[in-house]
Design a protein with these regions (language model features):
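Cytosolic nucleotide-binding catalytic cores of signal-transduction proteins
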Residues: 57-164
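Membrane-proximal linker segments that couple transmembrane helices to downstream signaling/catalytic modules
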Residues: 2-104
Length: 164
């Protein structure tokens, strides 16, 4: 009974987190739209074109999204990085930068662990090509300490905080 209560609490937390992300993003887009509108009605066309060509907002939002994804995922799977590394040969273990939670390789496998196995969907999320995802997956299977054909099945066995 306590375990069900805990699982429901975890679900509620992550549903609330999802809505917070969505509403925060909508609010940012409204602010951005209003800023562009003010620039346009004041006929600052050069500035408008500069803003529209800039990828700064998208880059900032992607960085925030990845950070939030990493935190949420590691909240669900707190031992994921060490469990993942346990599946690799000693000389192939992933060493993250001090400020990084996950890197692109780990995000690919985090998405796989969540059940997203389609390389196209993973590529869309990570804003890279499907061949890049395929290459990362192949490279990691080749670094595995376990049977390379079983590597992704072993990833799926990494347990979350609510699993016993």
């Amino acid at each position: 009974n306590n375990q069900l209560y805990e699982i429901n609490g975890i679900k509620e937390y992550y549903i609330a987190e999802f809505f917070d992300v969505c509403f925060s993003y909508i609010h940012k887009m409204e602010k951005y739209q209003n800023m562009l509108y003010k620039i346009a009605i004041n006929k600052y066309y050069d500035e408008l074109i500069k803003k529209l060509k800039s990828s700064a907002l998208i880059d900032e939002e992607l960085s925030a999204l990845y950070t939030r994804f990493d935190k949420v995922f590691l909240g669900l799977y707190p031992t994921f990085v060490s469990d993942f590394n346990a599946l690799l040969k000693d000389e192939e273990k992933i060493i993250l930068k001090p400020d990084a939670l996950l890197n692109r390789e780990l995000r690919i496998y985090a998405l796989l662990r969540l059940g997203i196995t389609d390389s196209g969907k993973i590529a869309n999320f990570l804003r890279c090509s499907t061949s890049t995802v395929y290459n990362y997956r192949t490279k990691m299977r080749n670094k595995a300490a376990v049977d390379r054909d079983e590597f992704e099945n072993e990833i799926m066995k990494i347990s979350s905080t609510q699993e016993t």
